[in-house]
Amino acid sequence: GADRVLVLDNSQIGPIFGRGVGQALAEAVRGANPYAVLFASTADGRDLASRLAARLELGLTGDAIDLEIDAEERLVQLKPALGGNVIAPILSKTLPNLVTLRPGLLTPATPEPGATATVDQLPAAPFDGRDVRLLKEEFQEDQVGLVLANAPVVLGVGMGFGGVENLAKIQEIARSIGASIAITRDVAHAGW
């Protein structure tokens, strides 16, 4: 488990990972000098990892599917290549290693009884230069189904489904069997 946890309260910065969060994380990484910094391959994780890599002038391996330690105790990052037909081993030329990992890839470690971690607060201040800002925030409360990663059943909708007029049917079926609905990129771009 973790021996030390760094917490960044971004309530003063805002809900998105802009330069203020990147700056605070970069200062923490410089101070701690870790061997590796791992991020989830989510929109926020990729954004923050790339900001950190740029600020610290480090390499970044994106969307790794596994990690190994080789005989020389180097972190080997395994990444799909050539359309997923090959798994390429990546060795960083810079330290710390920065890696984004696909969500759900790692199995949580079994906690050690009685183990504790120190919790340190990272200072955060709004970035005083130009930054990303949130223009509009919307919440959709009537979503049907479960998060795809946790869904026991997923119904897929592609362009062959016919059109937006047929979506009510698939939503009804999904509700009746407790399924989530996934759509292809073409369907999303069509605005169904």
Give a label for each model feature.
Residues 1-192:
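N-terminal glycine-rich FAD/FM-binding segment characteristic of electron-transfer flavoproteins
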